[in-house]
Amino acid sequence: GKFLHSAGKFGKAFLGEVMIG
């Protein structure tokens, strides 16, 4: 639960960086 939740947050932030980058 914790890992997946954290991974989800990180994934969204990462995708945001990729889109902007």
From Swiss-Prot:
* Presence of the UniProt keyword Aminoacyl-tRNA synthetase in the record: no
- Expression sites (tissue/organ): Expressed by the skin glands.
Asked if the keyword Secreted belongs to this entry, the reply reads yes
Q: What Gene Ontology cellular component terms go with this record?
A: extracellular region
Principal location listed in the UniProt entry: secreted
Q: List the subcellular locations.
A: Secreted
Keyword list, A-Z: Secreted
Recorded family membership: Belongs to the gastrin/cholecystokinin family. Magainin subfamily.
Biological function: Has no antimicrobial activity against tested bacteria.
Protein's name according to its UniProt entry = Magainin-B1
The species is Xenopus borealis
